[in-house]
């Protein structure tokens, strides 16, 4: 309606859509209605596209995505809704990729880098929240033991064999976030000397720290081993 017959200004329509999406998300959690939450997220992701006035204000776009994805993380704290997490992840990184291919220049680095880092860490956190929620719901089984100093090949094989079966490790979200975030990071740091190298150091440090944090949790062994594998890949 805004596009065909602009009765209201775009900011007002945008704000109304934000409120509507937030209300639907709250109702979805209270009523345990995953489909409603899914519709809210899809509508929320479509909102900036539907009400875009062509001004190209990317800071508003990325701030909105950060707010929306924070809401997804809040839902993940209470619900292990994997399709919802994946929808948010795919939509967010596709929007970022489309904008980057169309509009990114090195001058945008200082303002876009914080958003990229935030979403990388946020969706890594959502993968952790998913694992913990699945455990609390009884969705995990005991894992065969694997030494913390096991070779990388053994760790990857262990994850591939058991990660899907126990339904604790959301391998698509965890490794997909890693791959998408690092690819975008390499793209926006291409103008910097050794940009990709320093980015790999950062990723290795974060995943290594995450593995250390989970060192004492036997229930989340597969998640800890996944973080260790990610750290070794970037080391």
Language model segments and positions:
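Alpha-helical multi-pass membrane segments and their bilayer interfacial helix-loop junctions
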Residues: 1-235
């Amino acid at each position: 309606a805004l596009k065909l017959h602009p009765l209201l200004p775009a900011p007002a329509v945008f704000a109304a859509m934000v409120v509507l999406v937030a209300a639907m998300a709250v109702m979805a959690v209270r009523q345990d209605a995953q489909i409603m939450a899914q519709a809210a997220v899809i509508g929320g992701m479509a909102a900036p596209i539907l009400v875009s006035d062509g001004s190209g204000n990317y800071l508003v776009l990325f701030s909105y995505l950060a707010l929306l994805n924070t809401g997804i993380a809040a839902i993940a704290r209470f619900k292990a809704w994997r399709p919802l997490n994946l929808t948010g992840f795919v939509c967010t990184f596709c929007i970022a990729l489309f904008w980057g291919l169309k509009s990114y220049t090195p001058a945008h680095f200082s303002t876009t880098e914080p958003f990229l880092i935030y979403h990388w860490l946020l969706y890594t956190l959502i993968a952790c929240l998913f694992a913990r929620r699945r455990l609390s719901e009884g969705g995990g089984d005991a894992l065969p033991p694997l030494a913390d100093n096991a070779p990388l090949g053994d760790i990857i094989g262990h994850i591939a064999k058991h990660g899907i079966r126990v339904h604790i490790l959301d391998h698509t979200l965890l490794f997909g976030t890693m791959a998408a975030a690092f690819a975008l990071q390499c793209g926006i740091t291409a103008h910097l000397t050794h940009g990709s190298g320093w980015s790999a150091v950062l990723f290795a440090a974060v995943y290594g720290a995450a593995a250390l944090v989970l060192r004492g949790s036997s229930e989340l062994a597969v998640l800890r081993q996944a973080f260790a594998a990610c750290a070794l890949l970037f080391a």
